[in-house]
Amino acid sequence: QKANSFNSDFPATVKEVVAANLYSKAGLFKRIGKKYDPQVKKALQQVGMAEYENRLIGQLSGGQQQRVFIARALVNEPELLFMDEPTVGIDAQSVRAIMSLISELNKSGITIVMTNHDTPALVQASNKLLIFCEHGYEEFVTRADLTLNEVNEIFAGKRRHHHG
C-alpha cells in the first residue's frame, strides 16, 4: 500500500488499519478482538507510531501513513517483506525515517526486498543491491563493494561493474 494512493477520507483509525491485516488469523467478516491488541501495539511501536493508534489514518502525513502501512505488514511477524517504492511521495525527513526503519528491520532479521529509485537512500539502507539498468540486469553486489558514486554511474549506464 502506498501512502500517496490511499483515500485519506477512509474512516479508520491507525489501529484498525494495522489490525485489518489480521483477518486471515481471525477469520473473514469476524471482528478483530482485543486478543490481537498486543500484536498491533508491537507493530506500531516498531515503526514509532504507537501514540497515534486512535488517530484517523487520513489525519496523518504521508510519511506517517507509510509507517502505518509498514506496521500493517509487520503485524503478522513476517520473515520476508516486499516493498515497492516505500518512499515515493513523502518529504525528505520522512524518507530518512523510513529508510532508517527499513535498515533497523533488516538488522532485526527480516529480509527486505525493495524497489527504489532513490539511490542515496537505497545505498544507505541496504546491505545487498541488485542493480537493474535500462539494458537489464547489471550486478548483484554488497554495499561495501561500491560507493554511492559508483552505483550512480551504473544506474546512468556509464559503468559496468563485474565481480571476478
Where are these regions (language model features)?
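H-loop/switch region of ABC-family ATPase nucleotide-binding domains
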Residues: 116-117
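H-loop (His-switch) and adjacent beta-strand-loop-beta switch element
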Residues: 129-142
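Catalytic Walker B motif of ABC-type/P-loop ATPase nucleotide-binding domains
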Residues: 81-84
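Conserved ABC ATPase "signature" region
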Residues: 19, 34-52
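Helix N-cap at the start of a conserved alpha-helix in ABC-type nucleotide-binding domains
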Residues: 92-94
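Conserved ABC ATPase signature
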Residues: 56-60
